[in-house]
Amino acid sequence: MRLTGVSRGSAWTGLSVTTTLPNPSTRPGLRLPGRVTLAADGGEDVLVRHIRLGLVAQVEPEDPGSPRRLVQYHQWPIAGRFVVPGGRRRAVDFAVPLPWETPVTVFGGVPLMTLRTGLRTEVSVEPDLDQGEMVPVLVHPLPTQQHLLAALDTLGFVMRQAGLQQGRLPRVAQTLPFQQRLGFWAAPLYAGPMTELEVIMLTDPAGMEVLFWLDRRLSLAGVTHQSISRFRVWHAGADRRDWVSTVDGWLRHAIDRHAAAAAHADWSATIRESAHVSRHPDQPVAPGYGLGGTAGGAGVGGGGGGGDGT
């Protein structure tokens, strides 16, 4: 697959910009290769001051009443001053490293609900600034992210929403100005202690920090109780881990903390069944099962102890 973004030719600068990604599919932390081609459409030479690339995405503001807005969350300079001769073309190749916290937009080969991210090219030509059309970037999960989401699917969680929330989390080593949040309806085994589960995944070169945000509606009037638990897992050895047992252990730990923080509530957090019998082993998880949700999209097949939790 090859994706291309082309800017409109600028009558002021006489320059058109084309950005091409030979393979738009990638993962957080990997390099994204491509080429920016500039064409001086008129007979005059064009002096280019710089070329920059930026990653952009739709982000939910901290004020829930405000609409989503397009945010450029990372930028790379790829070229300094040079001249494009009149009637000629100039190509600039690049291979830029994606941030480790780049939001995942594709899961199980399917777009993850409405989440999108794109690459935008900025060309500075005195005194104008040309921004080319955005080129979609298809960000697939890292193995640790893949295993986590597959385990949640195997345990019976159903995705209900996915988005990017502006702001920084306290006491978390966060590098981007937002977090990717994935919301799930609680699986039947865990539906007593909680109503909804929100998952935040923050990755770095060594591993992944996972935040489980539990929410339980305590009354028909809409009163809720929320709590957050944090866990850490390493990329090394991810394929050898029993992810269903790991995630089930995280959930039970989070539910215990959730119950302790809401000791006044008239409900019990005890879970007596095993996670491994919530779905019969003779019923494998088919690709696309479970992450259908109410907001669209489809998802993932099964996954398969430990991890530090707080």
Whereabouts are the PLM-identified features?
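Short beta-strand elements
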Residues: E126-D153
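A beta-strand/beta-hairpin structural motif
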Residues: S66-G109, L129-Q131
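Internal, hydrophobic beta-strand segments that form the core of beta-sheet-rich folds
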Residues: L53-Q58, A95-E101, G109-D128
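C-terminal interaction module
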Residues: A173-H258
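Short aromatic-acidic-glycine turn motif
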Residues: L55-R69, R217-V223
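A short beta-turn/strand-edge loop motif at beta-sheet boundaries
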Residues: A40-R49
